[in-house]
Amino acid sequence: MAKVLCFLATNPQCVQPLREEVEMAIDEHGWTREGIAQMRRVDSFIKETLRFEGTTACVYFLRTPLMYLTSLLDGVQRKATKDVTLSDGTFLPRGTNVAFAVYAIEHDHHNYEDPFTFKPFRFVELQDKCGDPSKYQFASITHDSLGFGLGKSAW
């Protein structure tokens, strides 16, 4: 949440639309699941902040080429608790460390248009284009937006 507040402070033009959305949702639905579901801009702002800055510590301090390289190698890490064979035939013996380069995935131009630009309402625009307000929500997990993981291994 600290990153979200920092981005809100550095993007003051977003404060009013976010405030209006929250007030309208609460007036209409109160602090309920339905009310929170109406806060699409808030959801998009949070998701875009985490996409742009990442959820790993190194990404936040990207200032040098070495730190950039480190962030590409850093990401979601897990250790295989048993022998695993992946769908492509790759064998991972028990104890193998596996990592996903979250920053690289979330800044790939194949996954996001203009990935190095912070667009606070990027995901609202994507929802409007596809016509599905539940798609691209922060809580949804896709190959290009890992959020906090999935299942019992979620952060």
Predicted regions and their residues:
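Structural signal for hydrophobic/aromatic residues that build the beta-strand cores
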Residues: L18, V22, T49, L92-V98, ...
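Conserved cytochrome P450 K-helix E-x-x-R motif and the immediately C-terminal K′/meander segment
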Residues: E28-T90, T96
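Conserved cytochrome P450 K-helix/beta-meander segment immediately N-terminal to the heme-binding cysteine loop
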Residues: F100-Y136, F148
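Active-site proximal loops enriched in glycine and acidic residues that flank catalytic Cys/His/Asp
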Residues: F61-T64, L69, A80, A101-A104, ...
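Cytochrome P450 heme-iron axial ligand motif
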Residues: Q137-W155
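Active/binding-pocket-proximal capping segment
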Residues: E21-A25, P65-L66, T81-K82, E113-E125
